[in-house]
């Protein structure tokens, strides 16, 4: 068994991907080679890929797409790419054309989960509770049918990139302008208060397995990029201090959403808990594997160590 790990990418989450790759390489129980996609879209292989990992950045690559890789050498590809052109079905489609098994969700599920607007539409139709939201496209009038505060987010980014909390209607356009720097579509979501943020991991293909529920606590106005990836900025409680009924509800909703959206392999499912009601926020089909990332820590708390988690993900790619 030999694995190809692909990291980096052209999205704003480039550095997060490299941090995740460092952890995966350290704990992967199978022989693994690394390929890094630089910010310019070209690829780095071999020692140059490892050097980029060490530097935590790859501004320029060497090989244009498709890279000269010995694809027949690899049994499984692990696309550890966060955000657009990695988590949205793009790379998954390339791997489908190659006929290579890969870790994680397929093309359709990846694209659907990446789009915060479309995934909410599907989940709401299936009876999964979601926070009130409206989609706004670049160049169109912004009609928000609920009062602030609310969050403005690019529809297709992760790691809280491009997100603003808006307290007054007069600040909406500036928040949309920021979101439109990253996407042609934004979502405006009603801000819940007071609110607790919960996360649960799912592992499996048709029938997933839910991890214990965790809770994220922080002092920042919201769970932004710096809070997520700076050690000490957030406190992760595993298991979350919840009554058994709420914990069961969160796990059941995570598994239902996973199945409804057709996800395979893995996902981290994020929830809000407000006034006793649980709302699904989003599914991340390629969750972080950094030292502060919740997904591996959730499963470790459930008795699945990091190397065993990776082994199961690779084996799921082959089934």
From Swiss-Prot:
The source's domain of life comes to Bacteria
Name the keywords, alphabetized.
ATP-binding, Cell shape, Cell wall biogenesis/degradation, Cytoplasm, Ligase, Magnesium, Manganese, Metal-binding, Nucleotide-binding, Peptidoglycan synthesis
List its EC numbers. Answer: 6.3.2.4
The enzyme's main class, written as a single word, is ligase
Kindly list the cofactors needed.
Mg(2+); Mn(2+)
Q: What is its main location?
A: cytoplasm
Which residues are listed for Mg(2+) 1 binding in this entry? Answer: 270, 282
Supply one GO CC term from the record: cytosol
Catalytic activity reported: 2 D-alanine + ATP = D-alanyl-D-alanine + ADP + phosphate + H(+)
- Known pathway: Cell wall biogenesis; peptidoglycan biosynthesis
Localization, UniProt: Cytoplasm
Q: Mention one GO biological process in which this protein takes part, according to its record.
A: peptidoglycan biosynthetic process
The ATP-grasp domain covers: 120-315
Which InterPro entries does this entry report, sorted A to Z?
A: ATP-grasp, ATP_grasp_subdomain_1, D-Ala_lig_Van_CS, D_ala_D_ala, Dala_Dala_lig_C, Dala_Dala_lig_N, PreATP-grasp_dom_sf
Q: Provide the residue positions that the database annotates as binding Mg(2+) 2.
A: 282, 284
GO terms for MF: ATP binding; D-alanine-D-alanine ligase activity; metal ion binding
- SUPFAM superfamilies cross-referenced by the UniProt entry: Glutathione synthetase ATP-binding domain-like, PreATP-grasp domain
Q: How is the cofactor bound?
A: Binds 2 magnesium or manganese ions per subunit.
* Family per record: Belongs to the D-alanine--D-alanine ligase family.
Cited function: Cell wall formation.
Its protein name is D-alanine--D-alanine ligase
Tell me the organism: Thermus thermophilus (strain ATCC BAA-163 / DSM 7039 / HB27)
**Gene this chain is encoded by:** ddl
């Amino acid at each position: 068994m030999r694995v190809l790990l692909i990291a980096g990418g052209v999205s704003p989450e480039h550095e997060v991907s490299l941090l995740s790759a460092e952890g995966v390489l350290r704990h992967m129980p199978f022989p693994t080679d690394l390929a890094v996609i630089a910010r310019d879209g070209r690829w780095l292989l071999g020692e140059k890929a490892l050097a980029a990992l060490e530097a935590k950045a790859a501004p320029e690559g060497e090989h244009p797409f498709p890279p000269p890789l010995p694809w027949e050498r690899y049994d499984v590809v692990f696309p550890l790419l966060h955000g657009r052109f990695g988590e949205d079905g793009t790379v998954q489609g390339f791997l489908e054309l190659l006929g290579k098994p890969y870790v994680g969700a397929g093309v359709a599920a990846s694209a659907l989960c990446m789009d915060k607007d479309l995934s909410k539409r599907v989940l709401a139709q299936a009876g999964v509770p979601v926070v009130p939201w409206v989609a706004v496209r670049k160049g169109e009038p912004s009609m928000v049918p609920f009062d602030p505060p609310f969050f403005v987010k690019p529809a297709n980014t992760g790691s809280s990139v491009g997100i603003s909390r808006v307290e007054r209607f007069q600040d909406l356009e500036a928040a949309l302008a920021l979101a439109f720097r990253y996407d042609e579509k934004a979502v405006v979501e009603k801000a819940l208060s007071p609110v607790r943020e919960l996360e649960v991991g799912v592992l499996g293909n048709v029938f997933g397995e839910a991890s214990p529920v965790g809770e994220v606590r922080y002092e920042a106005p919201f769970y932004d990029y710096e809070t997520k990836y700076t050690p000490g900025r957030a406190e992760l409680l595993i298991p979350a201090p919840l009554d058994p009924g709420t914990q069961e509800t969160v796990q059941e909703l995570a598994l239902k959403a996973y199945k409804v959206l057709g996800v395979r392999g893995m996902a981290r499912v994020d929830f809000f808990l407000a006034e006793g009601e649980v709302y699904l926020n989003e599914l991340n089909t390629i969750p972080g594997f950094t030292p502060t990332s919740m997904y591996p820590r959730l499963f470790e708390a459930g008795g699945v160590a990091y190397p065993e988690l990776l082994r199961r993900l690779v084996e799921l790619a082959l089934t």
